[in-house]
Amino acid sequence: DVLRLCLWTKTRGIRLIVDESFVDFSCGMPDNTLLKDGILEEYPHLAVVKSISKSYGVPGLRLGILASADRELAAWIKKDVSIWNINSIAEFYMQIFGKYEQSYVRACNRFMKERDRFMQELSRVPFLNVFPSQANYFMCEVKPPMKARSLTGLLLKNHSICLLYTSPSPPD
């Protein structure tokens, strides 16, 4: 589907930016990334961004990449977008990161199995409509008669789970 979108945007002269920050958690990993020379060269209007710190669970390191075959875009980014310096801890992390790649792949595979199990369990809750996910989170619709605001209160009171309620609808 994403490659079809790449083709569609290419034929219309539209730049496409794809965020792959959570792609490591999706089925088909690691082969389902767009971060491949052949794909980037075939679709020079494509820019792929990925937060390494999100995927690998090291948010304090603030590591990420942007890849594109569009040299003008790369030159513009180098010129006009401030680049953060990488501190010594992040630099060391990048040096040892390959050593643990197979362990990371195994952990992602375990995560995918657990995600499937967890979705089945969530789907058993009568007032939730759980949408399938390839990420490390689920989107759920709270169905009547339960109200989202009431659910957040129950989860906090009964299970010490704190959720942020952000609906613009009036409170129940």
Predicted region positions:
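Conserved small/polar residues in nucleotide/adenosyl-binding loops
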Residues: 165-172
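PLP-dependent aminotransferase class I/II
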Residues: 45-124, 128-131
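Active-site pre-lysine segment of PLP-dependent enzymes
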Residues: 1-16, 22-55
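Short amphipathic alpha-helical segments and helix-helix/interface helices
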Residues: 2-7, 35-40, 74, 98, ...
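Hydrophobic residues at beta-strand termini and immediately following loops
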Residues: 49, 163-164
